């Protein structure tokens, strides 16, 4: 029985004893409620069978008006908004915003605070890459890697919690330094119905000393943990079949689309703000920039693995310096930094400064600046304009994921539907920063 129909739904007209049929591509939605969408990505795919003809990313589902919110509050009350942009790379976002404010104020954080920022930027980089490799492997069917990666993420998020009290949205960086000195005692697990006896002692074994002791112990063990990830993935036949030659981005395409970070370095372009435009104390530590050759999903994976090794190396150097060089972590300037609790409770002028600072903030001289950091996903920048008031006149945020997502249509064409998932994973997109 012939069931061919026209676009209108009725039977196709007869011509020379045959029915006319119209063959057209199939349009389907990937996301926004899809585990491989990495957030609220809605990808409208035009398919020719299993082959992608066109990909149309729809953005805006996580738009929260962050830039406008930051313009409605004093400078020092908007740092928390930055954490919620790329919510996997929290402190790097803070760093860009804080650097922009410091540039307009004409101040510089103490050296110790800059080393702490450098160390936590790299802890954040490892957190991000662990999430990317774990979830990317899970998207392609390798579940074990995710469990391994989250084992290390748990330890690093404990470092976040030790300095700020929060596991994710830290608000630890402040104009003029950081919120507080590194704690002398690493918090320990307490006995509970889930953690008792031998397990509790094992978990607390590395927590007997300070935070620096805990981080140093982590840097000694982490290279072996990376070896475990590589054992599971790097030479895995199925992993290579799903990633080698998939989503190839040429150096020319990467630069034309404004790609940064691993997306650019994976294509063979050795551009890294930590080397080209050093900030914090990156010019005082020794590290290398991993660069790919093929520009495919597999090279981007290898770059992230190599970057974790380099981040571990930077963290170890920062720990050694911080041990040997005590000092202030915040400027002693009550116009931009709050007085200590002891000073506030013993000196009336310090109390006034404290109240004014947290109620109305401070006036930032009129001017404009752009401050950027090498975030785990690429160049995260903050363009800040001040008109001399206590609130920004304009805040514009450069999210690396937005430029990367813009290129998806060009790069994904001609690939199979299953390859789209692999490419989204190595693009490392988070919609908090894309939609802002």
Swiss-Prot record:
Catalytic activity, EC: 7.1.1.-
Catalytic reaction equation(s): a quinone + NADH + 5 H(+)(in) = a quinol + NAD(+) + 4 H(+)(out)
DNA damage found in the keyword field: no
Enzyme kind, highest EC tier: translocase
Single GO cellular component term: plasma membrane
Compartmental location: Cell inner membrane
Superkingdom in the source lineage: Bacteria
Keyword Transport: yes
InterPro entries noted in UniProt: NADH_Q_OxRdtase_suD, NADH_UbQ_OxRdtase_49kDa_CS, NDH1_su_D/H, NiFe-Hase_large
Keywords of the record: Cell inner membrane, Cell membrane, Membrane, NAD, Quinone, Translocase, Transport, Ubiquinone
GO molecular function, one term: NAD binding
Membrane topology category: Peripheral membrane protein
Subunit text: NDH-1 is composed of 14 different subunits. Subunits NuoB, C, D, E, F, and G constitute the peripheral sector of the complex.
NCBIfam families: NuoD, PRK06075.1
Family stated for the protein in its record: Belongs to the complex I 49 kDa subunit family.
Function description: NDH-1 shuttles electrons from NADH, via FMN and iron-sulfur (Fe-S) centers, to quinones in the respiratory chain. The immediate electron acceptor for the enzyme in this species is believed to be ubiquinone. Couples the redox reaction to proton translocation (for every two electrons transferred, four hydrogen ions are translocated across the cytoplasmic membrane), and thus conserves the redox energy in a proton gradient.
Name this protein carries in UniProt: NADH-quinone oxidoreductase subunit D 1
């Amino acid at each position: 029985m012939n069931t061919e129909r026209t676009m209108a739904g009725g039977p196709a007209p007869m011509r020379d004893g045959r029915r006319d049929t119209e063959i057209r591509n199939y349009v389907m939605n990937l996301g926004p409620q899809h585990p491989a969408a990495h957030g609220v990505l809605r990808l409208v795919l035009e398919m020719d069978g299993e082959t992608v003809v066109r990909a149309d990313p729809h953005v805006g589902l996580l738009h929260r008006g962050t830039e406008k919110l930051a313009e409605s509050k004093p400078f020092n009350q908007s740092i928390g908004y930055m954490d919620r942009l790329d919510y996997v790379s929290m402190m790097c976002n803070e760093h860009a915003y804080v650097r922009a404010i410091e540039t307009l104020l004409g101040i510089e954080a103490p050296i110790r605070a800059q080393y702490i920022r450098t160390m936590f930027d790299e802890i954040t980089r490892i957190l991000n890459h662990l999430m990317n490799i774990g979830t990317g492997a899970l998207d392609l069917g390798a579940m074990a890697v995710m469990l391994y990666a989250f084992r290390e993420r748990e330890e690093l998020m404990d470092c976040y919690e030790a300095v700020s009290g929060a596991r994710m949205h830290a608000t630890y960086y402040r104009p003029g330094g950081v919120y507080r000195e590194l704690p002398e005692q690493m918090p320990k697990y307490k006995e509970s119905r889930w953690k008792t006896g031998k397990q509790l002692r094992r978990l607390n074994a590395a927590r007997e000393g300070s935070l620096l002791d805990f981080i140093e112990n982590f840097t000694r063990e982490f290279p072996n943990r990376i070896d475990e990830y590589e054992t599971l993935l790097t030479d895995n036949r199925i992993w290579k079949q799903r990633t080698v030659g998939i989503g190839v981005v040429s150096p020319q395409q990467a630069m034309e689309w404004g790609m940064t970070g691993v997306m650019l370095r994976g294509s063979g372009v050795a551009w890294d703000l930590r080397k080209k435009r050093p900030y914090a104390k990156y010019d005082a530590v020794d590290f290398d920039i991993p660069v790919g050759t093929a520009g495919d999903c597999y090279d981007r994976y290898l770059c992230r693995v190599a970057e974790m090794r380099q981040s571990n190396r930077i963290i170890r150097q920062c720990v050694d310096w911080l041990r040997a060089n005590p000092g202030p972590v915040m400027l002693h300037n009550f116009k931009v930094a709050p007085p200590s609790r002891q000073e506030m409770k013993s000196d009336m002028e310090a109390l006034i400064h404290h109240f004014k600072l947290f109620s109305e903030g401070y006036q930032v001289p009129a001017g404009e600046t752009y401050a950027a950091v090498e975030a785990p996903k690429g160049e995260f920048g903050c363009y800040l304009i001040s008109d001399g008031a206590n609130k920004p006149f304009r805040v514009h945020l450069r999210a690396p994921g937005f430029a990367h997502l813009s290129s998806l249509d060009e790069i994904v064409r001609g690939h199979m539907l299953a390859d789209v998932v692999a490419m989204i994973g190595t693009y490392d997109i988070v919609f908090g920063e894309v939609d802002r």
